[in-house]
Amino acid sequence: MREISQKDLNLAFGAGETDPNTQLLNDLGNNMAWGAALGAPGGLGSAALGAAGGALQTVGQGLIDHGPVNVPIPVLIGPSWNGSGSGYNSATSSSGSGS
């Protein structure tokens, strides 16, 4: 197997030598400017709302990178007839009517 060089990593992931915070600030400024520019015809309030929307978009996209990738959910989902349900099976449970 071939060893992966730093150049290969940069090409594959676009990592480069830039600071991630610098990229985040560039994206934040760019999205806020677009939001303000698109909201400007509606007045100052719309421009401010557009800039805030651009900021929220950037922050939301940045949070995706820091979230967990695989989170096990402790809820059994599925039909009970194949054993993947919640364990309750109305056909086999007793309702107290006696037998």
Swiss-Prot record:
One example of a Gene Ontology biological process annotation: monoatomic ion transmembrane transport
PTMs per UniProt: The C-terminal Ser is modified by attachment to a siderophore similar to enterobactin, which can bind one atom of iron. The modification consists of an ester linkage of the serine carboxyl to O6 of a glucose which is linked by a C-glycosidic bond to the 5'-benzoyl of a linear triester of N-(2,3-dihydroxybenzoyl)serine. Presence of the siderophore ester increases the antibacterial activity of the protein.
UniProt keyword annotations, A-Z: Antibiotic, Antimicrobial, Bacteriocin, Ion channel, Ion transport, Signal, Transport
Keyword Transport on entry: yes
Residues modified as Serine microcin E492 siderophore ester: S99
Keyword Transport listed: yes
Signal sequence segment: 1-15
Composition bias, Low complexity: 87-99
Region (Disordered), start-end ranges: 80-99
Family per similarity comment: Belongs to the class IIa microcin family.
Self-association and partners: Multimer. Possibly forms a homodimer or a homotrimer.
Role of this protein: Channel-forming bacteriocin. Forms cation-selective channels. Active on enterobacteria, with highest activity against E.coli. Not active on other Gram-negative bacteria, Gram-positive bacteria or fungi. The unmodified protein is active against E.coli and S.enteritidis. When the siderophore ester is present at Ser-99, antibacterial activity against these species is increased and activity is also detected against E.cloacae and K.pneumoniae. Neutralized by its immunity protein MceB.
Protein name stated in the entry: Microcin E492
Gene this chain is encoded by: mceA
